[in-house]
Amino acid sequence: MIRIDIATLFPDMCESYLSESIVGRGRKAGHIDIHCHNIRDYAGNKHNRVDDKAYGGGTGMVMQAQPIYDCITAIKQESDAPRVIYMSPQGRVLTQDIVKELAAEDSLIILCGHYEGVDQRVLDELNAEEISVGDYVLTGGELPALILTDAIARLQDGVLPNSDAYSIESHYNGLLEHPQYTRCLLYTSPSPRDRTRSRM
């Protein structure tokens, strides 16, 4: 069973998604171990501030190195995770091959950025690997972290009810899936049976 630790400014946002549906059931059944950690808990100031102005000026704020370093150091004392993944638009674009590689690990730490990004010094110190979910800009790293976690969770034994479910999906076998229909025939559009016949 893999353990995934997510370092974020919004742990409740992550928990809300990860407690539902297939991933939530997989967690409850003990097939995957996921923990969300609030970086603000390591701010070290009364206002729990974790951002600062960028060195050299410019617009926007940057996440400070120290709270991130302290948070991930604390996580490593519990999980001993060798790999830290930073969700970043500058990183390798996520593919199913990368998901399969990460899903084989015993534990992972996923770091969510925010504001204009993260102080590069802490990424270098942690030897963080950068992964992107696409060539576009989001307000934070939480959604990319959830995408990665969801994709990894699906490959863990017991998470999906059917052990063959992931192996026949288009991203897994490299082939596009055919259109999908339900068995209900009472719909104003042509029935699946009629559509199937029209394709023959």
Residue ranges and their predicted role:
Residues 2-41:
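Glycine-rich, flexible N-terminal cofactor/catalytic loop recognition
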Residues 38-49, 128:
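Short, hydrophobic/aliphatic alpha-helical segments
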Residues 50-70:
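Short, structured active-site "lid" loops
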Residues 164-189:
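C-terminal functional extensions of proteins
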Residues 5-7, 35-37, 85, 108-109, ...:
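Hydrophobic/aromatic beta-strand patches that form the interior of the parallel beta-sheet core
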Residues 118, 122-165, 169-171:
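Structured adenosyl-cofactor binding patch, chiefly the S-adenosyl-L-methionine
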Residues 187-198:
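Single conserved hydrophobic/aromatic residue that forms the stacking wall/gate
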Residues 64-114:
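S-adenosyl-L-methionine/SAH cofactor-binding core of RNA-modifying enzymes
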